[in-house]
Amino acid sequence: LRDHQILDVKGDWHDKRPGLRPGAWAFQYRNEHYPDTDDSSVVAMALDRADSDENRESVDRGVEWIIGMQCRDGGWGSFDADNTHYYLNHIPFADHGALLDPPTEDVSARCISLLAQRGYKTDHPAVAKGVAYLKRTQMADGSWYGRWGTNYIYGTWSVLCALNAIGEDPQAPYIQRAVA
């Protein structure tokens, strides 16, 4: 997996994050211009668990990229940062509504899970902003949406796992609302 880490190609994400070094993984082969935060978080977690000493440099670089890709609202999009120009979904050829890459709860949960595994706590700014984002985006019924798993069960379990990993109180009212 280390051999597939993108360390020298600055993709479209670099437009919004020009000072950020590459350090991510793509969903598919030969797609160096479009790495994503979701798969990068999972790969970094796997490398960290496999042999944290041998993989430390690679994982650290991945974590740096993940933190750098956090959106202003505290969440994470998949391929880009702050790509939330919703008006674009209303132009005639945007009938599939996928011209954007807004932050989503499931992807944000994966990024927070990586940070938790690496020892980050809720007092770290990226984690604090991420948890605040998840609290704001919780649905009235207690669930969270999962864009990439495309349902509320997927989104909710993803978020609950991340909140557990980061040490949120399972008795907190918002967590209890999710499991009720």
Functional labels for PLM-detected ranges:
Residues 1-180:
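Preference for long, amphipathic alpha-helical scaffolds in soluble/luminal domains
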